[in-house]
Every structure is written in C-alpha cells, then in structure tokens.
C-alpha cells in the first residue's frame, strides 16, 4: 500500500520543517510527500528545497492558488499513491507509527479511514482532542469526521471529483457529505489520535469563523434542504464538546 501525503503551505517558514520531519520520522516508508507551495516569499521555499536535496520522496509544486482547496486538488491530481492523506503545514503526526498503523488497518476495500485529532497551541501542547464514534458513514454522521486525519482512496476522487474551490474555508464539509452519499461506502475509524493540529489554522481562527458559518449554511441547505437548520444545529452542538 502506498500513501500520497499532501502538505499545503504558504509563508510558514517557522513550521514547515517540523511538518516535513514528522513525515520523515515515520516507520512506514512507502509514501510520497507532495508539497504544494502558494509562492511563499518568506524563506519557506528554501527550507523545502533543502529538504528535497536530502530526501527524494518530496514532490514540490510552487504555484499561486486561489485557496487551500485548489492547492489540495493540484496535489491529488498528481498523486500516485493508493490513498491520499493530508498533513497541513504546522501539523504533525501523533507519533512515528501513524502510517504503519494506518497501513495495517486499511485495504483496497476501504474507501475512507479517519482517526482522532489533537488540537494544540503553537508549542504543540495539547489543548483538547476531537474524538468520536461512527458505525456507518452517512450524511447525518459525516460532520463528526476530523477531516485532517482522513486517508481517502484515490478511487473516490475519480468517482465524485475533487474539492469544490468555490468554498474557501468549508469545502471539506462539502466533500465529506458527497463521499457519505456514495452507495455502500466503506469507512473505518481508528479510535486513537493520528494528527496534532496547531490551533489557528484556516478554520480555527476567530477571524474566519463567520465565513465558515456562511459556507456551512450554504452547504447544508444544498444537502438537506429544509432540514438543514436541524442538521446544522446538531453539528454545532457536537463541535461545542471540543471547545
């Protein structure tokens, strides 16, 4: 089994090296690391270039994108792995055995796998954990999934397409809802932490919260019509647990 791990970055020279090293420390080695850089100008690209000289597993794309999701799509389209994982700049794996663990639990019959997400401060001190239980993936349970922890079969993208770049901050919500509607979708949950995410990312910053609410409302209305308020309230009440 081969993984394609995608990192999107722009002007994050402080954190990008620790993210790269988190992947390099993994015990499991059958992966490629695709870094999509939105034309960083702060020295990020020099750090990535230095890492490439030392390790040949990195595929580097440097190009201006409209948003995070267009950058993710660029990476997914060139990915050669069986499964696509995400490791945003500033984030890291919970330990050096995450990919090894995922490899033992996943198979070509599984469409999507996810686990728990740890929120941390800038010094990576644990603040809270996004843990949950899902037996069957459906439009009514998809909101529980911690998107940064997902490993998604490349076949899924070929089946339903990529992230919708019209959404600038909540396209993962739209994507997971589309995935959940696939007939007989095969989902596996690992009830343990996979990713440590620094608080202050695209959708965890207070300055972005209203945009997130607007896009979520739009996505939920498209998917649930007049029941969207009820389903959206369920999501909000669920997320309050982790704040």
Task: Enumerate the predicted regions with their spans.
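Catalytic core of nucleotide-sugar-dependent glycosyltransferases
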Residues: 193, 205-229
């Amino acid at each position: 089994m081969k993984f394609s791990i995608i990192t999107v970055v722009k002007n994050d020279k402080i954190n990008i090296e620790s993210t790269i090293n988190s992947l390099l420390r993994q015990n499991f080695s059958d992966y490629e690391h695709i870094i999509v850089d939105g034309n960083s100008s702060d020295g990020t690209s020099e750090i990535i270039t230095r890492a490439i000289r030392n390790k040949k597993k990195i595929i580097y794309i440097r190009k201006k994108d409209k948003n995070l999701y267009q950058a993710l799509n660029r990476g997914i389209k060139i990915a050669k792995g069986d499964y696509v994982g995400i490791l945003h700049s500033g984030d890291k794996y919970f330990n050096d055995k995450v990919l090894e663990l995922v490899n033992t639990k996943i198979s070509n019959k599984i469409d999507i796998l996810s686990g728990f997400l740890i929120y941390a401060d800038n010094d990576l001190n644990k603040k809270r954990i996004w843990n949950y239980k899902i037996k069957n993936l459906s439009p009514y349970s998809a909101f529980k999934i911690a998107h940064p922890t997902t490993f998604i079969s490349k076949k899924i993208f070929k089946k339903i397409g990529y992230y919708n770049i019209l959404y600038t901050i909540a396209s993962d919500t739209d994507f997971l809802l589309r995935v959940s509607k696939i007939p007989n979708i095969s989902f596996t949950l690992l009830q343990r932490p996979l990713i440590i995410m620094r608080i202050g990312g695209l959708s965890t910053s207070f300055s972005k919260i209203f945009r997130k609410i607007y896009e979520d409302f739009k996505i939920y209305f498209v998917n649930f019509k007049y029941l969207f308020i009820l389903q959206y309230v369920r999501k909000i009440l669920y997320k309050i647990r982790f704040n």
